């Protein structure tokens, strides 16, 4: 039998005897509309929901709907803000607390909280940091909203950028790029879908890497520790890797049985 894993939210809801509902879609969903209307709630808080809240739902609570969005709005509206921030080598990442309006991520913002982005941070680590930050800040935010103390300021829509959904094929590395951009891509796509290269028809996913000091032709393997040359007389050193169909490995263990050796050329396609 397949076991269905409960989400942490479902688990805590059941423990505390709080209603837990999981509608696949809210659009034209009369049941959920009437459920929420009957609750007569003060405020709705939305985090990483992945669907547009229909306009008719937005009037069902006294103080509207607010969203915790994982970017410094108006930058990186949309589906993959954390990944795009890391890929873009942004100096800061953050969360924005905004009122939900009909257009996606366009509502006025009451507060933005930032953290410095270290360029060895991956998407999983940043997601965890921002989740903790959001959990810490939202309680005061809710109090301010309920007491009419929160000030929501319109976004500058002319400065908006969009964090489009990640496509798996974006993970393929281009050795004609510079080292910082390659590391940014590796970190932004960990753990999913992962940055990768193809060698002799097999896919190798890079889980962790750092900037190296070697110089060579783009795609050339410069050492038996899997240091690979890229553009601008730069290189990256791979620290953890996963061969297609295999478990993740530290690079020392991986290289013992690998057909990738010093002098191998890894192409872009």
Can you say where each PLM-predicted feature lies in the sequence?
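An anion-binding loop in the catalytic cleft
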Residues: 176-269
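One-carbon transfer enzymes
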Residues: 1-191, 234, 243-245, 262-269
